[in-house]
Swiss-Prot record:
Membrane topology summary: Peripheral membrane protein
GO-annotated biological processes: endoplasmic reticulum to Golgi vesicle-mediated transport; intra-Golgi vesicle-mediated transport; intracellular protein transport; pancreatic juice secretion; protein localization to axon; protein localization to cell leading edge; retrograde vesicle-mediated transport, Golgi to endoplasmic reticulum
Described purpose of this protein according to its UniProt entry: The coatomer is a cytosolic protein complex that binds to dilysine motifs and reversibly associates with Golgi non-clathrin-coated vesicles, which further mediate biosynthetic protein transport from the ER, via the Golgi up to the trans Golgi network. Coatomer complex is required for budding from Golgi membranes, and is essential for the retrograde Golgi-to-ER transport of dilysine-tagged proteins. Xenin stimulates exocrine pancreatic secretion. It inhibits pentagastrin-stimulated secretion of acid, to induce exocrine pancreatic secretion and to affect small and large intestinal motility. In the gut, xenin interacts with the neurotensin receptor.
Expression tissues: Uniformly expressed in a wide range of adult and fetal tissues. Xenin is found in gastric, duodenal and jejunal mucosa. Circulates in the blood. Seems to be confined to specific endocrine cells.
Pfam families: B-prop_COPA_B_2nd, COPI_C, TPR_COPA_B, WD40
Disulfide-bond pairs as recorded: none
CC annotations in GO: COPI vesicle coat; cytoplasm; cytosol; endoplasmic reticulum membrane; extracellular exosome; extracellular space; Golgi membrane; growth cone
Record-given protein name: Coatomer subunit alpha
Lineage, opening ranks: Eukaryota, Metazoa, Chordata, Craniata, Vertebrata
Length: 1224
């Protein structure tokens, strides 16, 4: 059972599917009727007029009507479009159990606890017939789907079949019916002869709750309180019981025939739904609920859907999945239909059956895996109990007879899923969830241990995708290892693109699109179930939900292409065609409009010519495209879609197109628009539009200030007059201040009663007459004349030297693709093209270099774009002043043609930009980046400051090798020298200014070179090994690493190299020493002992300890020799070495003394001086190499390090820097 939809509500007593729309009506025990969309899983409407439980409910087949009957004795007819009850039919005297529409006539059939069945005419709104005869509650009554029959079930333990052909004949003259009914108002309980009982079916031992006709056969099914489901057959003369289905252990509430299969469904108060095989009369499936009793069942008239109502709501379900099993390879589709494997050629549309499948499984094929190399298929079948799942391996016959195809012998085995992994191997996930690899004979070739998984999918040759509860893992079957994984729960289907570069992972409500390495590119959530998908050749994923065909681009953009009536399963997408299978396994081709996703794809891939073509020719409309373009940063493109002025205005502002914004603002004439336009125009320095905006919004203060800063005194005076007319004293005075008009200020102050201020203003500014006349107006008794400040300074606004008449000059930026091309559609389109053609000459670098300047350096008046400048001299070109003869100094006498012809004018080359190598140096403090840029001097300085390098001779070869990798070279034109490319390691986000060079040397390369050094050490080539270790050590400062772990690994690499170089140097020096005297022999033993304290690999440590052991044993220093023997045995040497060591150890332990005193204390930690090869015990002063960390006695400070041969011992440095992280 596949649950498609579930609701939680009061007890559901009635259910009805809409014949066409994905709707279902539920009538509840609390009096509410609910209308649900089971595909979208939403409640559409509620109808609440009944008083008490509603038991009967039914949709009309054609009209927007449904009927309901309740415990309030009322039958109500509703119009769901108008969302109201149209009328109520009264007549029943007790609860109404069921109500059904007739499939043809305007009749409603109702069954009631008043022991009658009534037929109503919903057009005339009257009762046309009463069927009496039952002597207990009538629990159910239904029309026959094609004949004039009614079946009813009653608690009187009978099922009755009624013949209503008399009613139908009578119904042809409606008047007769009405008069008849009116004439029997007193005795209508006893009915008329319009309907007669044809058969009475007795056989149930208790009350019958439900009876229903078979849609096509003369059969009736009934369910009763005796816990039995009975099947009855009838003919014209009689009806009889055929069989009984036993299994329910409580009252059977409802029983229906499956509309298209030989099945019966029943449900019961025992909290179960049971499916019975009609031919075998046995139970096929049982579905149980824990706490809810079932009350009603409904079958969809056209689809394989059922609904069941229970105590806590209802469920819509299918008995089995309807998804066809199919596999696509190239132009071929293989799919399973009616126990045949069929093959469809997409190109020729030829559809043939190639093979008959063996029968036996009662479950449909779950999925299919096709092997084109061997022309073989794997068909997997899922049982309700997963452990019983099987798969079949078939080889498709070469020359199949399409009319009567063969049924080749298939190989069947148990397993959840089988998938091809190679030409002749397939993987099986068995019931224990382990992976088996089998060959074409279905024999196991090997078992593979895999991480916990419950499903497997194909992932290319040798690879599988493994599904667990919350992720998908890419698994290499050959190497038996996990390659990658991505988080997504319960993936159902996996669809690879044709080139296997992308994969779509489909879950119930989600799609994750990943690349080949399983890096998630985008995650899409859907509210409706995702059904299927296929990749378009352009790299767009086309997928279907229950009700839409949609697209998804790998960047995450997705949208709807078209709506679907019924779910389909996409098999292939090519051009405008979507090839698919429907639920009846019929191949179909749907046409789609790919414009929207092609448009978005072109934008994402920056194919602007395609975008422009679509803008001009395609019917791309709608707010979503505009919003998309705006969101993605293409407002200038969106501008050409928009007709709405408000949207045009906001888009124009966003892309800085003041002209279009001004047009839109004029059309809208809204204060807010003018204010916004003013702000943007001000930012661009377009003060003429700013002035217009301030005038439109009457923003006089800002307008005055604009005139002040542009030096437009004439208009400022007008503003002062306007302020005076408006009686705006403050504005009037402010404008007078801006203008520096003292007499006006005195007048304003005098008029507004500020005599003291007016007097001070006049007197301070030397307006003596005015001051005197004001002085006389003061009353000496009441008013004091204010004192004039003798130190007053004149505050006067500066006089404008050059009033700004034109707008602020803007840089000529290169127009975007769209602005340039779309602008050329307008008036100057052809002209623009001509000018471009004419001016692409040798001087094409800069027309702006030809401005004529006057002696003050300003543009001459003729350079403006006034009418006079354009009007004259157009024929001769005189307005450009390029024909004038200038007297040039003789040294500038250049031969004609040298600069591209006399008429070309003076050419100013563009200023040189910063070279990529200089950018590298500017952006990085890592030495290797400076070496790659060729800046050896700065690289040396960095190495000196960071790790103390003072001797650069050994670095010469490394520098040159590294620099050689810093650039690529390629031939452009045959006549030109080679061009250089400068590859960046951060090329994805480098831009023009943030690049840093690609580095050839990797940490892993050095680690691999370390293995060679170990081999040289093992075979005893010490001097060669020391050279190789030193080469690695010197290369470490020339690395670039990305994380802290790699920094730590690099420092560990330095430590390893130091330990080996010091130790091997000690050993080399020891071997050179003479052995004549006792002192010389003691020195040899000391150096061998020191070597055992180097931190070496165990294999080398064994060799070192064996050497020291032999030397000390010969010197008769048995006590020390015993310690070396014990250390040697702890390392686990070979058996023969261990045996000899134990012999020496036992000899030493018999006499545990040292014959001679040596400068070696094994119990006191020490470092070896890398110059003198003597121990520096802990606590003694020590100097270190800043790069390798090698230890030296203080007397060696300032000398060259013996380990690195390039650094200064004891130098104070910043420290090793090989990652940008170390500078944060």
């Amino acid at each position: 059972m596949l649950t498609k939809f579930e609701t939680k509500s009061a007890r559901v007593k009635g259910l009805s599917f809409h014949p066409k729309r994905p709707w279902i009506l539920t009538s509840l025990h609390n009096g509410v009727i609910q209308l649900w969309d089971y595909r979208m899983c939403t409640l559409i409407d509620k109808f609440d007029e009944h008083d008490g439980p509603v038991r009967g409910i039914d949709f009309h087949k054609q009209q927007p009507l449904f009927v309901s009957g309740g415990d309030d004795y009322k039958i109500k007819v509703w119009n769901y479009k108008l969302r109201r009850c149209l009328f109520t039919l009264l007549g029943h005297l007790d609860y109404i159990r069921t109500t059904f529409f007739h499939h043809e006539y305007p009749w409603i059939l109702s069954a009631s606890d008043d022991q009658t069945i009534r037929v109503w005419n919903w057009q005339s709104r009257t009762c046309v017939c009463v069927l009496t005869g039952h002597n207990h509650y009538v629990m159910c009554a239904q029309f026959h789907p094609t004949e004039d029959l009614v079946v009813s079930a009653s608690l009187d333990q009978t099922v009755r079949v009624w013949d209503i052909s008399g009613l139908r004949k009578k119904n042809l003259s409606p008047g007769a019916v009405e008069s008849d009914v009116r004439g029997i108002t007193g005795v209508d309980l006893f009915g008329t002869t319009d309907a007669v009982v044809k058969h009475v079916l007795e056989g149930h031992d208790r009350g019958v709750n439900w009876a229903a006709f078979h849609p096509t056969m003369p059969l009736i099914v009934s369910g009763a309180d005796d816990r039995q489901v009975k099947i009855w057959r009838m003919n014209e003369s009689k009806a009889w019981e055929v069989d009984t289905c036993r299994g329910h252990y409580n009252n059977v509430s409802c029983a229906v025939f499956h509309p298209r299969q030989e099945l019966i469904l029943s449900n019961s108060e025992d909290k179960s739904i049971r499916v019975w095989d009609m031919s075998k009369r046995t139970g096929v499936q049982t579905f149980r609920r824990d706490h809810d009793r079932f009350w009603v069942l409904a079958a969809h008239p056209n689809l394989n859907l059922f609904a069941a109502g229970h105590d806590g709501g209802m469920i819509v379900f299918k008995l089995e999945r309807e998804r066809p099993a199919y596999a696509v390879h190239g132009n071929m589709l293989h799919y399973v239909k009616d126990r045949f494997l069929r093959q469809l050629d997409f190109n020729s549309s030829k559809d043939v059956a190639v093979m008959q499948l063996r029968s036996g499984s009662k479950f449909p094929v779950f999925n299919m895996s096709y092997n084109p190399a061997e022309n073989a298929v794997l068909l997997c079948t899922r049982a309700s109990n997963l452990e019983n799942s099987t798969y079949d391996l078939y080889t498709i016959p070469k020359d199949a007879d399409s009319q009567n195809p063969d049924a080749p012998e298939g190989k069947r085995s148990s397993g959840l899923t089988a998938v091809w992994v190679a030409r002749n191997r397939f993987a099986v996930l068995d019931r224990m969830h382990s992976l088996l690899i089998k060959n074409l004979k279905n024999e196991i070739t090997k078992k593979v241990q895999v991480p916990n998984c419950d499903e497997i999918f194909y992932a290319g040759t040798g690879n599988l995708l493994l599904r667990d509860a919350d992720s998908i893992t890419l698994f290499d079957v050959q190497q038996k290892r996990t390659l990658a994984s991505v988080k997504i729960s319960k993936v159902k289907y996996v669809i690879w693109s044709a080139d296997m570069s992308h994969v779509a992972l489909l879950a119930k409500h989600a799609i994750v699109i990943c690349n080949r390495k399983l890096d998630a590119l985008c995650n899409i959530h859907e509210n409706i179930r995702v059904k299927s998908g296929a990749w378009d050749e352009s790299g767009v994923f086309i997928y279907t939900t229950s009700n839409h065909i949609k697209y998804a681009v790998t960047t995450g953009d997705h949208g709807i292409i078209r709506t679907l009536d019924l779910p389909i399963y996409v098999t292939r997408v090519k051009g405008n065609n979507v090839y698919c299978l429907d639920r009846e396994c019929r191949p179909r081709v749907l046409t789609i409009d790919p414009t929207e996703f092609k448009f978005k794809l072109a934008l994402i891939n920056r194919k602007y010519d395609e975008v422009l073509h679509m803008v001009r020719n395609a019917k791309l409309v709608g707010q979503s495209i505009i919003a998309y373009l705006q969101k993605k940063g293409y407002p200038e493109v969106a501008l050409h879609f928009v007709k709405d002025e408000k949207t045009r205005f906001s888009l124009a502002l966003e892309c800085g197109n003041i002209e279009i914004a001004l047009e839109a603002a004029k059309a809208l004439d809204d204060k807010n628009c003018w204010e916004k336009l003013g702000e943007v125009a001000l930012l661009q320095g377009n003060h003429q539009i700013v002035e217009m905006c301030y005038q439109r919004t009457k923003n006089f203060d800002k307008l005055s200030f604009l005139y002040l800063i542009t030096g437009n005194l004439e208009k400022l005076r007008k503003m002062m007059k306007i302020a005076e007319i408006r009686k705006d004293m403050s504005g009037h005075y402010q404008n007078a201040l801006y203008l520096g008009d003292v007499s006006e200020r005195v007048r304003i102050l005098k008029n507004c009663g500020q005599k003291s201020l007016a007097y001070l203003t006049a007197a301070t500014h030397g307006l003596d007459e005015e001051a005197e006349s004001l002085k006389e107006t003061f009353d000496p008794e009441k008013e004091t004349i204010p004192d004039i400040d003798p130190n007053a300074k004149l505050l006067q606004p500066p006089a404008p030297i050059m009033p700004l008449d034109t707008n602020w000059p803007l840089l000529t930026v290169s127009k975007g693709f769209f602005e340039g091309t779309i602008a050329s559609k307008g008036k100057g389109g052809a002209l623009a093209a001509d000018i471009d053609i004419d001016t692409v000459g040798t001087e094409g670098w800069g027309e702006d270099a030809e401005l004529q300047l006057d002696e003050d350096g300003f543009v001459e008046a003729t350079e403006g774009l006034g009418d006079d400048a354009l009007g004259k001299g157009q024929e001769e070109g005189g307005g450009w002043d390029v024909e004038e003869d200038l007297e040039l100094p003789p040294e500038l006498d250049i031969s004609p043609g040298a600069a591209g012809g006399a008429e070309d004018g003076f050419f100013v080359p563009p200023t040189k930009g910063t070279s990529p190598t200089q950018i590298w140096c500017n952006n990085s403090q890592l030495p290797v980046d400076h070496i790659l840029a060729g800046s050896f001097e700065t690289a040396m300085r960095l190495l000196h400051d960071q790790v103390g390098v003072i001797q650069f001779g050994p670095y010469k070869q490394l520098f040159l090798q590294t620099y050689a990798r810093g650039r690529t070279t390629y031939q452009a034109l045959p006549c030109l020298p080679s061009m250089y490319g400068y590859p960046n390691r951060n090329w994805k986000d480098a831009g023009l200014k943030n690049g840093v060079p690609a580095v050839g040397l990797k940490l892993n390369d050095l680690i691999q070179r370390l293995q060679l050094c170990y081999q040289l050490t093992t075979v005893g080539k010490f001097e060669e090994a020391v050279e190789k270790f030193r080469s690695i050590l010197l290369s470490v400062p020339l690395l670039v690493v990305d994380n802290k772990q790699e920094i730590a690994e690099a420092q560990q690499l330095i430590t390893i190299c130091r330990e080996y170089i010091v130790g091997l140097s000690v050993e080399t020096e020891r071997k050179k020493l003479p052995k004549e005297t006792l002192e010389q022999q003691k020195r040899i033993c000391e150096m061998a002992a020191y070597f055992t304290h180097s931190n070496l690999q165990p294999v080398h440590m064994i060799l070192v300890l064996r050497t020291a052991l032999n030397l000390f044993f010969k010197l008769k220093n048995f006590k020390t020799a015993a310690t070396f023997a014990r250390r040697l045995l702890e390392l686990g040497p070979k058996p023969e070495v261990a045996q000899q060591t134990r012999k020496i150890l036992s000899a030493c332990e018999k006499n545990p003394t040292d014959a001679y005193q040596l400068n070696y204390d094994m119990h006191n930690p020490f470092d070896i001086c890398a110059a003198s090869y003597r121990p520096i015990y802990r606590g003694k002063p020590v100097e270190k190499c800043p790069l390798s960390g090698a230890c030296y006695s203080p007397e060696f400070k300032g000398q060259i390090c013996r380990v690195t041969t390039v650094t200064e011992i004891g130098k104070d440095v910043i420290g090793l820097r090989i990652s940008p992280l170390q500078f944060r």
